[in-house]
């Protein structure tokens, strides 16, 4: 069983981050970066939408998808995500949220459906707004902060120089995993990407 929803409605792929140029290179904006890459691959650009999100209607792996970046700050992502989902009449089972994950080493990608928010306020806001935790997550590993650095400060800093050299590959793997998730379902995608370092 592949866990791919059987209806032919669109997918909603949400990248989490904070809006504005001052946050663009932050670790917390990994989700935005992946959605931007997906839009670029599809030959599209995200544009302002009445749902308080930047949105693009694209085809990913031959399937209709809505890409979205909430224009609220991370902690308030749920409102725009819920508004986009309602506008396009997308089932929560077809929602994929791409976000940074502290507890996964930098360079790794992990996928799951449902579960807790692990202290991620963007996920907490989305779960509350959707009324369910049962949506797909693509978790982009950013690693733990060094020493005693506050994780809240760490996620709001830009990727380090050494990380920036590896970042394009991480974003490519993350975007690839979104497309495979849509075509093949959760378990095959987990089997492929969880085996990578």
UniProtKB/Swiss-Prot annotation:
It is an enzyme of class 3 (hydrolase). The record marks 100 as: Stabilizes the basic form of H active site to accept a proton. GO terms for cellular component: cytoplasm. SUPFAM superfamilies: Peptidyl-tRNA hydrolase-like (SSF53178). Its EC number is 3.1.1.29. The keyword ATP-binding does not apply. One of its GO terms (biological process) is protein quality control for misfolded or incompletely synthesized proteins. The active site is at residue 28. It is found in: Cytoplasm. It comes from the Bacteria. HAMAP family: Pept_tRNA_hydro_bact. Monomer. Belongs to the PTH family. Hydrolyzes ribosome-free peptidyl-tRNAs (with 1 or more amino acids incorporated), which drop off the ribosome during protein synthesis, or as a result of ribosome stalling. This is Peptidyl-tRNA hydrolase. It comes from Frankia alni (strain DSM 45986 / CECT 9034 / ACN14a). The gene is pth.
